Amino acid sequence: MAVDDYEELLKYYELHETIGTGGFAKVKLASHLTTGEKVAIKIMDKESLGDDLPRVKTEIDAMKNLSHQHVCRLYHVIETPNKIFMVLEYCPGGELFDYIIAKDRLTEDEARVFFRQIVSAVAYIHSQGYAHRDLKPENLLIDEDQNLKLIDFGLCAKPKGGLDYHLMTCCGSPAYAAPELIQGKAYIGSEADIWSMGVLMYALMCGYLPFDDDNVMVLYKKIMRGKYEIPKWLSPGSVLLLSQMLQVDPKKRISVKHLLSHPWLMQGYSCPVEWQSKYPLGYVDEDCVTELSVFYKCSRTSTSRLISEWNYDHITASYLLLHSKKSHGKPVRLKRPLAVGDQPVTSFKELRPKSTLDFEEPNCGEIAYVFGSMEFSDDELFSEDFAYSCFEPHTPKEYVKGRSEFHSVDSAPSTPVVQRYARHKSEDKENCDAALGKDENVFLHPAPWTPTPRRKQNEKKGILTTPNKNSHTKEKNQSKETPTKKPITTGEELANVISPERRCRSVELDLNQAHVDSAQKKKGAKVFGSLERGLDKMITMLTPSKRKGYAREGPRKLRAHYNVTTTNIMNPEQLLNQIVKVLPSKNVDYVQKGYTLKCKTQSDFGKVTMQFELEVCQLSKSEMVGIRRQRLKGDAWVYKRLVEDILSSCKV
């Protein structure tokens, strides 16, 4: 875990705070130096990935080949001896799930807006030969303009046999899985996605799942029966659409093609859902080419040719981010970075990668790596090395809508499935190579490293330390800190607590566990916590504008987003004390640092079942005090119920 791993990355990006983290990956907010645009950088450790390393190919290949207004955009891929960096579109609005929590449930008009965007994204990926196979609110991010972006393609499948190819792998989240998957039958990926979309639509409009139970086998029986409650507030049109998607027999389910112009989705709209991409990969913008050629002192012809190679190197990233600026109405201009010790880049020649990204041909059966399902180590979450973060939302707007027709999606039934537990060595028979004609090399194996012992954990659980309210620090310094364990989310107000009868929870287990012996389950990913924390500190020192010795003494000022609950309490210390008093009664352990409480729950056997953060904050445009809530690990619906219970007990 040498700093050398970050050398290439730091040529082009300034790293900010950690906004998501896990056992083998973390996500950092960053700024692209030449455009100034914000990006999210997913940092994966090869050693921690282990046998899942080849499965990174599934995620990266899919994102290289998918370019759509409702799919999260990949900008840049960097490989070093120990790390893989994926530079992605930054979506500050957080998970769609947070929006559901804030609203309790969505009105049909709100749900229709979001669901049209979901249908658009899914229809597009099906038309490209992919099935997502892990559709759920946690895998949909909201941008600054309330538009959705589909993420997490680690379980996607592109069958070698085409869209009619039947799949066998059982994967995804149990509560969203189609009956044919949990029965272990061969299935068509696109049909399974339609079922998941039905569950997702129900969750949007009801605020809870149609099929849910503590016991996974009971949950499976409910799914296979296909019977669910129909709340009185649902309109006849929405009830009909749900029944058409949640058909136990996949052949009776509505197709994506018919979804595009379904009467419920057309209500209030003059045209069917627009599924085609607004920015196909073949298109190169002339204004962006001109700016890049002038900036790097290269001919327009050479610049256009380099962009058209779509190598997902810094050239690709610079072009895509510059084009994003143009779509926002911003000036199409690049700025020359002058980082300490860096020489300005003067030509594209200097930007060409020293080596291309290498992939390893999958030889580990049907193992799948899910980027969005990060596991957290207790040492990392409850460590002494805790910092705060503050950032301003900023994300590209959606392109202007245009009319389009859908041609062949309903003939795109199948998509592959990849198991997390299978460890036998065999070819990946379901996924065809998404990057035809591109490098067929393999990921380089990680270089040997010498482990460094962890530092002692001196934090004590459940100890309240009232922050010093007399000291103040400038807001601009907060955004330069490099904190840990805070995924992207935003939110407004928590309202309309779910009724007591909604107490059953979704089971966040591998679907595979129903069909496989426990000896086949893979071991937990290793976490190099102390090494990562030390590296974060080194990066903080090396990155310009980082300030040593920064400490926050008062509550942060935040915008009233979807994951911030407003309260009627004006004193932040009083609110903090109320939360601390309530947590033990809910069997929640916590570690406090300033105004943030890092919380976790455990099973009777000591296994961590839930990890989340509660932070007392000041709302930036008022004198009101709020609570920022953030799920880090565990079932999303159990988290929703628990946080609502805590806030209700605090009487905020």
Swiss-Prot record:
Post-translational modification here is noted as: Autophosphorylated: autophosphorylation of the T-loop at Thr-169 and Ser-173 is required for activation. Phosphorylated by the maturation promoting factor (MPF), composed of cdk1 and a cyclin-B. Also phosphorylated by some MAPK. Phosphorylated during oocyte maturation. Dephosphorylation destabilizes the protein.
Residues carrying Phosphothreonine? 169, 415, 450, 452, 482, 484
Where would one find the signal peptide in this protein? none
Q: Where does ATP bind?
A: 19-27, 42
Q: Where is the KA1 domain?
A: 603-652
Q: Which reaction does it catalyse?
A: L-seryl-[protein] + ATP = O-phospho-L-seryl-[protein] + ADP + H(+); L-threonyl-[protein] + ATP = O-phospho-L-threonyl-[protein] + ADP + H(+)
Location (main, coarse): membrane
The UniProt entry's GO biological process terms, in alphabetical order, are:
apoptotic process; cell population proliferation; erythrocyte development; hemopoiesis; neural precursor cell proliferation; positive regulation of apoptotic process; protein autophosphorylation; regulation of heart contraction
Q: Where is this region: UBA-like?
A: 284-323
Q: Name the protein family.
A: Belongs to the protein kinase superfamily. CAMK Ser/Thr protein kinase family. SNF1 subfamily.
Query: Tell me, what does this protein do in biology?
Result: Serine/threonine-protein kinase involved in various processes such as cell cycle regulation, self-renewal of stem cells, apoptosis and splicing regulation. Also plays a role in primitive hematopoiesis, possibly by affecting the expression of genes critical for hematopoiesis. Plays a role in cytokinesis during early development.
Kindly provide the name given to this protein in its UniProt entry: Maternal embryonic leucine zipper kinase
Q: Which organism is it from?
A: Xenopus tropicalis
